[in-house]
């Protein structure tokens, strides 16, 4: 499998989320490099990094959806929970000595691309509107308003 390449249709228009998604894709490419160089310890480190980073990304994304009052937030959270359980199973298989790198990378890339293009695009407009409203309300707030605009505007 070749290295993954960011595609413009993966942008949801919330800069911080788009940057986090790009970082996950970079990690998947690191997984590929570690696997092709036959470095099992490096593969394990990348798997741990992907899992940890993805969980923090999900928590951040879910907080944004909740704050924006996104009506399908609970369903979106359940999708995240199922994904985390699935990846945890791969992690256990790896720890048991199984070579799951290709299978995991394929599953992760397909899932991520489909999730961004579907589930994440679905909440983007509502979250952007909420963030823009918040920034407008706090625009005179100096640093906070500028920071919010930089990250979310």
From Swiss-Prot:
InterPro entries: Bacteriohemerythrin-like, Haemerythrin_Fe_BS, Hemerythrin, Hemerythrin-like, Hemerythrin-like_sf, Hemerythrin_metal-bd. The keyword Transport applies. GO terms for molecular function: iron ion binding; oxygen carrier activity. Keywords: Iron, Metal-binding, Oxygen transport, Transport. It holds the Pfam family Hemerythrin. Fe cation 2 binds at residues 61, 76, 80, 115, 120. It comes from the Bacteria. Disulfide bonds: none annotated. The keyword Metal-binding applies. Fe cation 1 binds at residues 21, 57, 61, 120. Coiled coil: none annotated. Belongs to the hemerythrin family. Monomer. Oxygen-binding protein. May be involved in a storage mechanism or for delivery to oxygen-requiring enzymes. The oxygen-binding site contains two iron atoms. NCBIfam families: bact_hemeryth, hemeryth_dom, PRK00808.1. This is Bacteriohemerythrin.
